[in-house]
């Protein structure tokens, strides 16, 4: 390409290189099929361009849509996605948090089942950014919807229209969403001075 090694290095690491030299380097790379070593780049830049995504189940439509959106955004930003499926197993979530940290990914997105003390301890020890989806955890970047308020408003709407209301769904053991939904359901009854009968559950 007729340029110095330092110029090639800057090109490979997205540093400043004039457009004319950039085109010459790119032409030689395309002709030779050269691919820089990912390990060498990681050592040099301290970045892997990998983001780990831990999911509770792979066969969920809503999780699938989340992962598709995450994948699109990461790809547009030059990152690759590493996917870890836990089958709703808290121990597997902990294991994958450790594995991804050891792989030195640039970040972790956790779509967890239940955030336990072990999760909190491990998340606090991470030296990489972590984002938690579908749950609220104080002190962390979280993206979630308000299950409590959604259940409350839906139940209130049904009560106002005189529709027979029954609570269908999840149990108290489902801390990620179930408990909040149940509390929202009960609060809607309380708001209108009614009592939710036991057989509704």
Locations of the language-model features?
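Aromatic/hydrophobic pocket-lining residues that form the small-molecule binding cavity
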Residues: 63, 93, 151
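Bacterial carbohydrate/catabolite-sensing allosteric modules
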Residues: 31, 72-77, 125-132, 136-201
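Cofactor-binding loop segments of dinucleotide-utilizing enzymes, especially the Rossmann-like FAD-
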Residues: 56, 86, 113, 135, ...
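Short beta-strand segments enriched in small/hydrophobic residues
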Residues: 5-10, 43-59, 157, 164-171
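Central regulatory/effector-binding core of bacterial HTH transcription factors
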Residues: 72-117, 121
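N-terminal helix-turn-helix DNA-binding module of bacterial transcription factors
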Residues: 1-48
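N-terminal helix-turn-helix/winged-helix DNA-binding helices
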Residues: 30-68, 76-79, 87-89, 99-102
